[in-house]
Amino acid sequence: MERARTWVETSRRYSQEENDPVSGYRLDCSGYVSMAWRLAPPGETTVELPDYCVLIDKDDLLPGDAVMNGGPGTDGNAGHVMLFGAWVDAGRTAFWTYEQISTGTVRRIMPFPGLPYRPYRLRTVTAG
Protein backbone atom coordinates (compact mmCIF):
# COMPACT_ATOMS: atom_id res chain seq x y z
CA MET A 1 0.00 0.00 0.00
CA GLU A 2 3.00 2.28 0.40
CA ARG A 3 3.32 2.59 -3.38
CA ALA A 4 -0.40 3.34 -3.69
CA ARG A 5 -0.14 6.07 -1.08
CA THR A 6 2.63 7.86 -2.99
CA TRP A 7 0.23 8.68 -5.83
CA VAL A 8 -2.45 9.84 -3.35
CA GLU A 9 0.06 12.17 -1.66
CA THR A 10 1.12 13.63 -5.02
CA SER A 11 -2.11 13.13 -6.96
CA ARG A 12 -1.58 12.24 -10.60
CA ARG A 13 -4.02 13.48 -13.20
CA TYR A 14 -6.09 10.85 -15.04
CA SER A 15 -5.26 9.73 -18.58
CA GLN A 16 -5.77 6.52 -20.52
CA GLU A 17 -3.34 7.67 -23.21
CA GLU A 18 -0.39 9.05 -21.25
CA ASN A 19 2.08 7.49 -18.84
CA ASP A 20 3.48 8.94 -15.64
CA PRO A 21 6.80 10.56 -16.61
CA VAL A 22 8.57 9.24 -13.49
CA SER A 23 7.29 5.65 -13.13
CA GLY A 24 6.21 4.92 -16.71
CA TYR A 25 2.79 3.63 -15.60
CA ARG A 26 -0.41 4.58 -17.41
CA LEU A 27 -2.36 7.23 -15.52
CA ASP A 28 -5.67 5.35 -15.40
CA CYS A 29 -7.19 3.02 -12.80
CA SER A 30 -5.51 -0.16 -14.03
CA GLY A 31 -2.16 1.58 -14.51
CA TYR A 32 -2.41 2.75 -10.89
CA VAL A 33 -3.15 -0.76 -9.58
CA SER A 34 -0.38 -2.18 -11.78
CA MET A 35 2.03 0.34 -10.23
CA ALA A 36 0.96 -0.54 -6.69
CA TRP A 37 1.31 -4.25 -7.45
CA ARG A 38 4.72 -3.78 -9.12
CA LEU A 39 3.60 -5.19 -12.47
CA ALA A 40 5.67 -4.09 -15.47
CA PRO A 41 5.06 -0.56 -16.80
CA PRO A 42 2.98 0.79 -18.44
CA GLY A 43 0.63 -1.62 -16.63
CA GLU A 44 -2.15 -4.01 -17.51
CA THR A 45 -5.72 -3.05 -18.48
CA THR A 46 -8.91 -3.99 -16.63
CA VAL A 47 -9.34 -6.71 -19.26
CA GLU A 48 -5.91 -8.21 -18.46
CA LEU A 49 -5.60 -7.66 -14.68
CA PRO A 50 -7.81 -10.65 -13.70
CA ASP A 51 -5.18 -12.91 -15.32
CA TYR A 52 -2.79 -11.88 -12.51
CA CYS A 53 -5.32 -12.47 -9.72
CA VAL A 54 -7.42 -15.00 -7.91
CA LEU A 55 -11.02 -14.33 -7.04
CA ILE A 56 -11.50 -14.14 -3.26
CA ASP A 57 -14.41 -13.78 -0.88
CA LYS A 58 -15.39 -10.28 0.21
CA ASP A 59 -14.73 -11.26 3.84
CA ASP A 60 -11.13 -12.17 2.96
CA LEU A 61 -10.18 -8.74 1.57
CA LEU A 62 -6.85 -7.38 2.85
CA PRO A 63 -5.19 -4.01 2.23
CA GLY A 64 -3.82 -3.99 -1.31
CA ASP A 65 -6.38 -6.38 -2.75
CA ALA A 66 -8.49 -5.19 -5.67
CA VAL A 67 -12.18 -4.60 -6.13
CA MET A 68 -12.72 -4.81 -9.87
CA ASN A 69 -15.12 -4.90 -12.75
CA GLY A 70 -12.71 -6.42 -15.22
CA GLY A 71 -11.86 -9.25 -17.52
CA PRO A 72 -13.20 -10.29 -20.92
CA GLY A 73 -16.41 -8.55 -21.85
CA THR A 74 -15.53 -5.21 -20.29
CA ASP A 75 -13.57 -4.14 -23.39
CA GLY A 76 -11.52 -1.97 -21.06
CA ASN A 77 -13.97 0.93 -21.39
CA ALA A 78 -16.59 -0.20 -18.88
CA GLY A 79 -14.05 -1.74 -16.53
CA HIS A 80 -12.77 -0.17 -13.34
CA VAL A 81 -10.44 -1.31 -10.59
CA MET A 82 -9.68 0.10 -7.15
CA LEU A 83 -7.45 -0.97 -4.28
CA PHE A 84 -8.99 -2.05 -1.00
CA GLY A 85 -7.60 -0.13 1.98
CA ALA A 86 -9.67 -1.15 5.02
CA TRP A 87 -13.23 -1.69 6.16
CA VAL A 88 -14.94 1.41 7.51
CA ASP A 89 -17.63 -0.43 9.47
CA ALA A 90 -18.09 -3.75 11.27
CA GLY A 91 -20.87 -4.72 8.85
CA ARG A 92 -18.41 -4.49 5.96
CA THR A 93 -20.71 -2.35 3.87
CA ALA A 94 -18.16 0.40 3.13
CA PHE A 95 -14.40 0.55 2.70
CA TRP A 96 -11.50 2.90 2.16
CA THR A 97 -10.45 2.74 -1.46
CA TYR A 98 -7.37 3.97 -3.26
CA GLU A 99 -8.11 4.63 -6.90
CA GLN A 100 -7.40 6.64 -10.00
CA ILE A 101 -10.58 8.43 -11.14
CA SER A 102 -11.34 11.24 -13.59
CA THR A 103 -10.19 13.88 -11.07
CA GLY A 104 -6.91 12.07 -10.29
CA THR A 105 -5.66 9.79 -7.51
CA VAL A 106 -7.88 9.63 -4.43
CA ARG A 107 -8.39 7.84 -1.15
CA ARG A 108 -12.06 7.84 -0.25
CA ILE A 109 -14.83 5.88 1.41
CA MET A 110 -16.99 3.81 -0.92
CA PRO A 111 -19.96 1.56 -0.29
CA PHE A 112 -19.01 -1.98 -1.19
CA PRO A 113 -20.30 -2.32 -4.75
CA GLY A 114 -22.31 -5.28 -5.93
CA LEU A 115 -21.87 -7.11 -9.20
CA PRO A 116 -20.17 -6.70 -11.59
CA TYR A 117 -17.48 -5.67 -9.05
CA ARG A 118 -15.67 -8.58 -7.43
CA PRO A 119 -12.79 -8.90 -4.93
CA TYR A 120 -9.42 -10.13 -6.20
CA ARG A 121 -5.95 -10.82 -4.79
CA LEU A 122 -2.71 -10.65 -6.74
CA ARG A 123 -1.48 -14.24 -7.25
CA THR A 124 1.91 -13.56 -5.65
CA VAL A 125 0.38 -12.39 -2.35
CA THR A 126 -0.37 -14.77 0.52
CA ALA A 127 -2.37 -13.94 3.64
CA GLY A 128 -0.69 -14.16 7.01
Sequence positions of predicted segments:
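Residues in intrinsically disordered, low-complexity segments of regulatory proteins
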Residues: T6, A36, A86, F95, ...
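Catalytic cores and adjacent binding grooves of peptidoglycan-active enzymes
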Residues: G104, M110-P113
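N-terminal capping segments
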Residues: M1-W37
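Low-complexity, Gly/Ser/Thr/Pro-rich intrinsically disordered linker/tail segments
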Residues: P113-G128
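...with weaker cross-activation on analogous glycine-rich loops/strands in unrelated enzymes
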Residues: P41-V106
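Short capping/connector residues at structural and topological boundaries
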Residues: N19, W37, V54, L61, ...
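Extracytoplasmic low-complexity repetitive segments enriched in small/polar residues
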Residues: M1, R5-W7, W96-E99, I109-M110
